[in-house]
Design a protein with these regions (language model features):
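C-terminal catalytic/motor cores of large multi-domain enzyme assemblies
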Residues: 1-197
């Protein structure tokens, strides 16, 4: 059993066949373009800020998507090795830009886990505290340390990531590695540099 999900067995024959018909990620990838009323979003954010409550665009969109996942859990399914799994949590990854001690820019990936009772305000706080903790110049999160280790020795990255891929395909990848990976997630987003948290 995978640490990040359980196999879905009560699928129709068509659903079970889809990973075979579309075996590559790009075969089944869905892209959607949605236009939102930005004025309504800005008005909501301003109204909440006047009340003394901080809300960001990112936290608002993540919260809305999470509510959709709670109403339709199949959105949070994933495919590994042509088998369909139900993710046993909701998390989202995003990348932030931070500055190194020498002043050069660097980026790091972050992962935030949500609970069913989270609101737009608790999501905002979780994002803010995660960014704040990881913007420290001297702070490297576990993902940064793992990447530095993997790329520290020539040829090691290929072996490390090859082994991780093998373990993942056979449902043996440890939870600790899944928690490090920004790609084992329900949603990947990006934080705008103009957005104030």
């Amino acid at each position: 059993m995978r640490p990040d999900g359980t196999r879905v067995r009560d699928l129709t024959a068509i659903m079970q066949a889809l990973p075979y018909v579309m075996p590559k990620r790009y075969d089944a990838q869905n892209w959607a373009e949605e236009y939102l009323d930005e004025d309504a979003i800005r008005d909501y954010i301003r109204a909440k800020r006047r009340e003394g409550r901080t809300v960001t665009h990112m936290s608002l969109l993540v919260s809305a998507y999470y509510r959709a996942v709670l109403k339709n859990p199949k959105i949070n399914y994933f495919v590994m090795n042509r088998r369909i799994y139900k993710r046993n949590h909701f998390c989202f990854s995003f990348v932030i830009l931070k500055t190194r001690a020498d002043g050069t820019p660097d980026e790091t990936s972050l992962k935030v886990y949500l609970e069913p009772d989270d609101t737009v305000f608790t999501v905002t706080e979780k994002i803010r505290s995660t960014i704040e903790k990881n913007q420290n110049v001297r702070h490297n999160n576990d993902t940064d340390r793992f990447a530095k280790f993997a790329f520290g020795v020539p040829g090691l990255a290929r072996a490390v990531f090859g082994l991780a891929g093998f373990l993942d395909r056979h449902d043996l990848l440890p939870r600790s590695i899944i928690e490090l990976s920004p790609f084992h997630t329900s949603q990947i987003g990006r934080a705008s540099c103009r957005e104030r948290v």
